[in-house]
A protein has these predicted regions:
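A short helix-to-beta-strand connector/capping loop
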Residues: 38-45, 144-146
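NAD(P)H-binding glycine-rich loop region in Rossmannoid oxidoreductase-like domains
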Residues: 7-13, 17-18, 34, 40, ...
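Hydrophobic/aromatic anchor residues within beta-strands of the central parallel beta-sheet
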Residues: 46, 90, 113, 148-151
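Residues at the starts of beta-strands that form the adenosine-phosphate
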Residues: 14-16, 43, 111-112, 147
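Conserved Rossmann-fold NAD(P)-dependent oxidoreductase catalytic core, especially the SDR/UDP-sugar
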Residues: 71, 75-133, 141-142
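Helix N-cap at the beta1-alpha1 junction of Rossmann-like dinucleotide-binding domains, i.e.
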Residues: 21-25
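Residues forming the Rossmann-fold NAD(P)(H) cofactor-binding site
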Residues: 2, 6
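NAD(P)-dependent short-chain dehydrogenase/reductase
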Residues: 106, 127-169
Length: 169
């Protein structure tokens, strides 16, 4: 998500709000952007929120008018299947939170909704791939009332959580 945020920031948007459950990720993205690009005229803010939370719902109700919503959230590692508690969280994040943000986007008149998926959704052999495949089915169903696009990505070299990223650290 940081690379996407930087690309959007460089285009001087009127409003760029970034939501991530990790406060540390938000601090890092702001530091990186400020040191690389400085400031924009638009409204750039970060929010350390869980999309599944009541606080996120209040945030959307307070300022939920967005032309574009990019949902880049995911529990994307097969190791997240190791216990039933993390597995339940994976289903919440990958399926139910996606459905929630699509519904909120449709209700608020969002022009375009984008959601990232994985190559593992093509022919799922594990719960992570299956959860993303189910998410894609929700995307297809919701596309009747919301302009939606999605892309399947394989593991991206040096992305957060990848093996190559750990070497870079």
């Amino acid at each position: 998500g940081q690379a996407v945020t930087k690309e959007i920031f460089k285009r001087n948007p009127k409003k760029l709000h970034v939501v991530d459950i990790s406060e540390n990720n938000m601090v890092e993205v702001v530091r990186d952007i400020r040191s690389s690009f400085g400031y924009i005229d638009g409204d750039f803010q970060t929010f350390a929120l869980d999309i599944g939370s009541l606080e996120y719902d209040a945030f959307i109700k307070a300022d939920g008018q967005y032309d574009y919503v990019l949902n880049l959230s995911a529990l994307k590692h097969v190791r997240s299947e190791k216990d039933p508690f993390t597995l339940m969280r994976m289903i919440d994040v990958n399926i139910f939170n996606t459905e929630k943000t699509m519904r909120q986007s449709a209700e608020s008149g969002t022009k375009k909704y984008f959601c990232v998926s994985t190559d593992k959704a093509a022919n799922p052999v594990n719960m992570m791939g299956a959860s993303k495949r189910i998410m894609e089915m929700f995307l297809i169903r919701r596309s009747i009332d919301l302009n939606i696009s999605t892309a399947r990505f394989a593991n991206v070299a040096f992305s957060d959580g990848s093996l190559l990223h750990s070497f870079d650290q």
